[in-house]
């Protein structure tokens, strides 16, 4: 039996708390059996018993009034004409009108009614009594009900080996059916004997699926065709694209070939808003986005490689794990990657490099959900790692709004189709968070524990009243939110627009400030480099000057030595044999001259003298 609604009561309303304690068992009364009564007991055998096997019926009577009906007919002929005048004859009617207009009673009646009609006509010309003063404003129902949600139904995977509900899709006509894709996302850990079937459920019959879809490989994505509710598009784990027509049965109607399909699991498939309703595109973790036409699905019509370096190299491509397309922007699409980068692309670009317009980086892990706001397409929601972020196309460096980091990993998210300021997120602890930016921005307006298993996907109905959540064990829970979360509030569009514009302006100011700081740091770094270069240049100049001075003085000293040596060579040599020593005074004078010449020349002079003596032949 499912819990439909949980009644919550404050602790103070339970009354006084009961304090129990343990104690030993006590015997309050002991009645022994009476052997006399046991002796009087007689067992009846056999025993006659009556059984009524027919269904219980009751008689009811009702007395209703008899409703009598009869057929009536009216034949209307243009009145005001005599019997002898045929209204179909133009000449007879003109002749009769002229006759009546000449009648005095007709003239008097027209004169009397003319003044009254003239007054009414003037009033009509002056004031438009049929003007709708508040026609531009939408009729908004103001609700003061607190945000709440309740479980409507639960759809469980009928297979014994449970699989993860990886994707959900609502039936486009009336939203009375729900298509669920089942697969095992753990790499190379699929259990033996696991079924590949996915199912279409009827909301009023949760016990048994309406149709089973039988692909060749487990489905990761499954989407209804918005123009033909009998056609579904699926992305397989082996990279193939499959198409079903429920009128033809459970088997695949169209299937792409392995050679021209994706190399990795297909995590995103979207139908395009084309005239034929047969065009779609898909994305995979192999880094490719492919366009298909289900009339010829054997190979893609176009391929775009998610290489942000714009070199069209598949080995550098980023793996796509989420896909977004807005019908109001038919040439643009966005891709969420495993590396936490959102790539904005233009399909109609002339060259492959121009197809990747820009990137948005802000998540630390894969982006599991990516969706534009249905009211303001330039703002989009991303869900990854531990937070959800709201971006603006005008601010590329960072998101304009984001949630706090949660303890559990976020797995999916979506905008409300009826309220521009409301979005939903699912977490791996089995919790569904409903955020209302008008109500509060720091915390979710409602946090609901859906199940104990991790939630992997969610999908919101077009009316915004119902939310379907898929879990790790294949359980799809259908929730109904309160009217306060599914009804457009008064002035909510203006408030949401002002919130997004305000946060966008704030991010632009911060980006400009950061840009200035980076330029200043770059200028300082360049200045430091210039100072270092100037210091190095100054040191080099000093070294060159010192070296030049040393070389200059060496040349000068060498030249002086050479000149002194030449001067000594030209000086006449004293002849000791011819000198006549006349006295001690003359001898002292000669010795003094020799000492002076030895002091001037130093050691070199001595050496030169020795050379000269050797040349002259010392005795």
Curated annotation (Swiss-Prot):
Acidic residues bias: start-end ranges: 581-597
SUPFAM superfamilies: WD40 repeat-like
Ranges: WD repeats: 214-254, 261-302, 362-401, 405-445, 450-489
Subcellular location: Cytoplasm, Cytoskeleton, Cilium axoneme; Dynein axonemal particle
InterPro entries to which the protein is assigned, alphabetical: Dynein_IC (IPR050687), WD40/YVTN_repeat-like_dom_sf (IPR015943), WD40_repeat_dom_sf (IPR036322), WD40_rpt (IPR001680)
GO cellular component, one term: axoneme
Transmembrane segments: none
GO molecular function, one term: dynein heavy chain binding
Principal subcellular localisation of the protein: cytoplasm
Keyword ATP-binding: no
BP-aspect Gene Ontology terms: cilium assembly; cilium movement; determination of left/right symmetry; outer dynein arm assembly
Region (Disordered): 566-619
UniProt keyword list: Cell projection, Cilium, Cilium biogenesis/degradation, Cytoplasm, Cytoskeleton, Dynein, Microtubule, Motor protein, Repeat, WD repeat
Signal listed as a keyword: no
SMART domains named in the record: WD40 (SM00320)
Family membership noted in the UniProt record: Belongs to the dynein intermediate chain family.
Subunit text: Consists of at least two heavy chains and a number of intermediate and light chains. Interacts with DNAAF2. Interacts with DNAAF6/PIH1D3. Interacts with HEATR2; probably involved in outer arm dynein assembly. Interacts with CFAP53.
Function: Part of the dynein complex of respiratory cilia.
PANTHER family in alphabetical order: DYNEIN AXONEMAL INTERMEDIATE CHAIN 2, DYNEIN INTERMEDIATE CHAIN
Protein name as annotated: Dynein axonemal intermediate chain 2
Natural source organism: Rattus norvegicus (Rat)
Lineage: Eukaryota, Metazoa, Chordata, Craniata, Vertebrata
């Amino acid at each position: 039996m499912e819990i439909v609604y949980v009644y919550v009561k404050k602790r103070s309303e339970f009354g006084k708390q009961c304090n129990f304690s343990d104690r030993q068992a006590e015997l309050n009364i002991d009645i022994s059996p009476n052997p006399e009564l046991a002796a009087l007991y007689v067992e009846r055998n056999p025993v006659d018993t009556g059984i009524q096997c027919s269904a219980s019926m009751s008689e009811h009577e009702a007395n209703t009034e008899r409703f009598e009906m009869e057929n009536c007919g009216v034949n209307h002929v243009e009145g005001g004409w005599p019997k002898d005048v045929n209204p179909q004859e133009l000449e007879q009617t003109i002749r009769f009108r002229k006759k009546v207009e000449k009648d005095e009673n007709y003239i008097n009646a027209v004169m009397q009614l003319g003044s009254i009609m003239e007054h009414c006509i003037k009033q009509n010309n002056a004031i438009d009594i049929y003007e709708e003063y508040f026609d531009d404003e939408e009729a908004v129902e103001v609700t003061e009900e607190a945000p709440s949600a309740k479980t409507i139904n639960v759809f469980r995977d009928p297979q014994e080996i449970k699989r993860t509900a990886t994707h959900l899709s609502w039936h486009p006509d009336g939203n009375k059916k729900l298509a669920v894709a089942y697969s095992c996302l753990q790499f190379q850990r699929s259990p033996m004997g696991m079924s590949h079937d996915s199912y279409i459920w009827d909301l009023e019959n949760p016990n048994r699926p309406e149709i089973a879809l039988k692909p060749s490989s487990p489905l990761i994505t499954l989407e209804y065709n918005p123009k033909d509710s009998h056609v579904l598009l699926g992305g397989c784990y082996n990279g193939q694209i499959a198409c079903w027509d429920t009128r033809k049965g459970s088997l695949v109607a169209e299937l792409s070939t392995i050679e021209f399909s994706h190399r990795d699991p297909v995590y995103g498939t979207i139908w395009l808003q084309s005239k034929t309703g047969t065009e779609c595109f898909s994305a995979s973790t192999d880094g490719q986005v492919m366009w298909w036409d289900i009339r010829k699905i054997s190979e893609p019509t176009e391929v775009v490689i998610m290489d942000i370096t714009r070199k069209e190299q598949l080995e550098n491509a980023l793996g796509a794990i989420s896909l977004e397309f807005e019908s109001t922007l038919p040439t643009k699409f966005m891709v969420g990657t495993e590396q936490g980068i959102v790539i904005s692309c233009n399909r109609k670009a002339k060259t492959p490099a121009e197809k990747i317009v820009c990137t948005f980086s802000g998540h630390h892990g894969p982006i599991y959900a990516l969706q534009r706001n249905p009211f303001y397409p330039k703002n989009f929601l991303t869900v990854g790692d531990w937070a959800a972020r709201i971006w603006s196309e005008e601010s590329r460096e960072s998101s304009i709004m984001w949630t706090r980091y949660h303890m559990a990993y976020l797995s999916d998210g979506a905008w409300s189709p009826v309220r521009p300021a409301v979005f939903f997120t699912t977490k791996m602890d089995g919790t569904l968070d409903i955020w209302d930016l008008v109500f509060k921005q720091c915390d979710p307006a409602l946090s609901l524990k859906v199940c104990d298993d991790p939630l992997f996907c969610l999908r919101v109905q077009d009316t915004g009243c119902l939310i379907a959540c898929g879990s790790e064990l294949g359980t799809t829970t259908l929730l109904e939110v309160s009217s306060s979360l599914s009804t457009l509030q008064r002035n909510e569009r203006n408030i949401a627009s002002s919130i997004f514009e305000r946060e966008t302006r704030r991010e632009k100011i911060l980006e400009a400030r950061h840009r200035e700081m980076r330029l200043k740091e770059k200028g300082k770094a360049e200045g430091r480099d210039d100072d270092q270069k100037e210091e190095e240049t100054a040191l080099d100049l000093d070294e060159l000057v010192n070296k030049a001075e040393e070389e200059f003085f060496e040349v000068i000293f060498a030249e002086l030595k050479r000149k002194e040596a030449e001067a000594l060579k030209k000086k006449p040599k004293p002849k000791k044999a011819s000198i006549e020593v006349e006295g001690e005074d003359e001898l002292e004078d000669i010795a003094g001259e020799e000492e002076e010449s030895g002091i001037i020349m130093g050691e070199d002079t001595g050496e030169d003298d020795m050379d000269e003596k050797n040349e002259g032949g010392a005795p």
